[in-house]
Amino acid sequence: MVMMSAKEASTLWGISTRRVTTLCSAGKIPGASKENGSWQIPANAEKPADARVRTGAYKKSAMPAHLPLPVGISDYRLASTEYYYVDKTLMIKDFLEQRPMVSLFTRPRRFGKTLNMDMLRVFFEKTEEDTSKYFTNKAIWACGQKYRDYQGKYPVIFLTFKDVKRNTWEETYAHLTRLIGEEYLRHADLADSPACNDFEKAVYQRIVSSPADSTDYISSLKTLSSMLHKHYNCPAVIIIDEYDTPIQQGHLMGFYDDAVSFMRGLFSGGLKDNRSLAFGFLTGILRVAKESIFSGLNNLVVNSVLDKKYNTYFGFTADEVA
């Protein structure tokens, strides 16, 4: 039988050598044996499902040193193939083990929030392209089939409000509705989907043609998720990146109440008691008071910079920059 050392297994599986030896000692790796004080492991052994992956270890060994860092890059497919990407895909595993209905991640600027949300979009979204190729060499893929089964399973609604920094509510509203219209257009198959009713198709046409009325936009997440659910026979994942940017801008420029009112209606329709919602993700810098914007959203789980859960997936750990 061809054997490999603990160090070789560490490189292959993306975990520390110490973790490999601990797993061997605990009998977690079938066929592992100690010879002359060193662990020998079958070369065809699979990484145990409970092995903790040292995020970034895979890329440090596998990625050429000359690749640039993905500074300012928020496109996961681009960052993970053309740049020196630190593997954060175990965030998906941690989420799937708990499956909260709606998760809010609050982190400072430049902590990789948008890149992580795009990673979630690429992983979960059902598309014509086989997007599994962006994960087969990542830590999440080594965790087993029960996690792989979620890849490419859901229709996804993705909105990022990170650039909505306008001086008036009128300009902000126009920017927000344009982003919503662009996301509707991304799902162009819905325009003539036989699974959707005429009322939904009429709303779809008003939003993509603009201008629709404010009621259409406030209920746009609920409408789009319902249409996607019917079209794909599968509930939708909703991802809202930098949800609080328009609200912060409203506070600075004097239209806070208008921004909060619109966002409250938008989120309530899409994330509260929505039968067409599989699960939702939001990111932001601040947690705006629940009473002002997340009123009645009892299924919201907040993960802040002070929480240990998910803390290794935003920014970099000491090991990752060592």
Where are each of the predicted segments found?
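Phosphate-binding site recognition
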Residues: 61-322
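Ca2+-coordinating acidic residues in Ca2+-binding motifs
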Residues: 8, 45, 242
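A short, Lys/Arg-enriched interface patch at domain edges and termini
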Residues: 43-62
